[in-house]
């Protein structure tokens, strides 16, 4: 029998307690540790969120991502309003932690059917946004083709994966002073590029989402590989598109 003193009424701690390694409350800390080793979530930046069974599980804001524990995870009922923040339906909210500033942007991905959304501060993502701006101006998008790793990125919902000769296009939006203020631009980019699974944020990082946790993770890895490769290709004077 559970000791009720361990879980005060209304805390809903049972939502983040599971022996299943695939449970979102266990997956998010593991993913954040992995992303930290890759330099994607340095200095408390970035975030990860998973949608499952009418709930949204989100890593907290302003914490060292490699040290997150299951009990640090916020849980929202889904669907839930993006704005105002006070209208969001938190059913588990750790008292000493702050909700993720990425929340409305993650919700934008979930509203389009994603099962997982990842935000990183990858240096390679930042660098390609600057290179695109210099070469194409602020309205340019990142484009690359004839690279094998492109096969790790979907063509669009239910359209299969990109091929070697296909051109990958990732929209770029301008950064804002506050994370939540990116939401409108992110949603506009999603509308203009309905097949995209990622949006770059200039001088900031990238948002990536996928139908499942595994797909979001592998797509994020593939994109970061392509961004790093693109930076190195640029150094050698090699074109991204043939």
Curated annotation (Swiss-Prot):
<comment type="pathway">
    <text>Amino-acid biosynthesis; L-methionine biosynthesis via salvage pathway; L-methionine from S-methyl-5-thio-alpha-D-ribose 1-phosphate: step 2/6.</text>
</comment>
<keyword id="KW-0486">Methionine biosynthesis</keyword>
<dbReference type="Pfam" id="PF00596">
    <property type="entry name" value="Aldolase_II"/>
</dbReference>
<feature type="binding site">
    <location>
        <position position="121"/>
    </location>
    <ligand>
        <name>Zn(2+)</name>
    </ligand>
</feature>
<feature type="binding site">
    <location>
        <position position="204"/>
    </location>
    <ligand>
        <name>Zn(2+)</name>
    </ligand>
</feature>
<feature type="binding site">
    <location>
        <position position="102"/>
    </location>
    <ligand>
        <name>substrate</name>
    </ligand>
</feature>
<feature type="active site" description="Proton donor/acceptor">
    <location>
        <position position="148"/>
    </location>
</feature>
<keyword id="KW-0862">Zinc</keyword>
<dbReference type="InterPro" id="IPR001303">
    <property type="entry name" value="Aldolase_II/adducin_N"/>
</dbReference>
<dbReference type="InterPro" id="IPR027514">
    <property type="entry name" value="Salvage_MtnB_euk"/>
</dbReference>
<dbReference type="GO" id="GO:0008270">
    <property type="term" value="F:zinc ion binding"/>
</dbReference>
<dbReference type="GO" id="GO:0005737">
    <property type="term" value="C:cytoplasm"/>
</dbReference>
<comment type="similarity">
    <text>Belongs to the aldolase class II family. MtnB subfamily.</text>
</comment>
<keyword id="KW-0479">Metal-binding</keyword>
<dbReference type="GO" id="GO:0019509">
    <property type="term" value="P:L-methionine salvage from methylthioadenosine"/>
</dbReference>
<keyword id="KW-0028">Amino-acid biosynthesis</keyword>
<comment type="function">
    <text>Catalyzes the dehydration of methylthioribulose-1-phosphate (MTRu-1-P) into 2,3-diketo-5-methylthiopentyl-1-phosphate (DK-MTP-1-P).</text>
</comment>
<feature type="region of interest" description="Disordered">
    <location>
        <begin position="1"/>
        <end position="23"/>
    </location>
</feature>
<dbReference type="InterPro" id="IPR017714">
    <property type="entry name" value="MethylthioRu-1-P_deHdtase_MtnB"/>
</dbReference>
<keyword id="KW-0456">Lyase</keyword>
<dbReference type="InterPro" id="IPR036409">
    <property type="entry name" value="Aldolase_II/adducin_N_sf"/>
</dbReference>
<feature type="binding site">
    <location>
        <position position="119"/>
    </location>
    <ligand>
        <name>Zn(2+)</name>
    </ligand>
</feature>
<protein>
    <recommendedName>
        <fullName>Methylthioribulose-1-phosphate dehydratase</fullName>
        <ecNumber>4.2.1.109</ecNumber>
    </recommendedName>
</protein>
<keyword id="KW-0963">Cytoplasm</keyword>
<dbReference type="GO" id="GO:0046570">
    <property type="term" value="F:methylthioribulose 1-phosphate dehydratase activity"/>
</dbReference>
């Amino acid at each position: 029998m559970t000791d009720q003193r361990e879980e005060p009424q209304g805390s809903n701690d049972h939502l983040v307690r599971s022996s299943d390694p695939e449970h979102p409350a266990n997956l998010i800390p593991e993913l954040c540790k992995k992303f930290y080793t890759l330099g994607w979530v340095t200095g408390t930046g970035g975030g990860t969120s998973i949608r499952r069974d009418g709930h949204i599980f989100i890593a907290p804001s302003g914490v060292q991502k490699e040290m997150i524990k299951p009990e640090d995870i916020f849980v929202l009922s889904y669907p839930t309003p993006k704005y105002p923040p006070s209208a969001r339906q938190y059913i588990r909210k750790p008292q000493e932690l702050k909700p993720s500033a990425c929340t409305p942007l993650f919700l934008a991905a979930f509203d389009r059917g994603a099962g997982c959304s990842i935000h990183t501060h990858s240096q390679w993502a930042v660098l390609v946004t600057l290179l695109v701006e210099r070469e194409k101006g602020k309205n340019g998008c990142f484009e690359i083709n004839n690279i094998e790793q492109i096969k790790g990125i979907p063509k669009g919902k239910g359209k299969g994966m990109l091929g070697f000769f296909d051109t990958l296009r990732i929209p770029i939006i301008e950064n804002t002073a506050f994370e939540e203020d990116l939401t409108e631009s992110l949603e506009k980019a999603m509308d203009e590029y309905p097949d995209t699974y990622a949006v770059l944020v200039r001088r900031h990082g990238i948002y990536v989402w996928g139908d499942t946790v595994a797909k979001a993770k592998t797509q994020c890895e593939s994109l970061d590989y392509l961004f790093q490769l693109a930076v190195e290709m640029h150094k050698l004077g090699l074109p991204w598109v043939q």
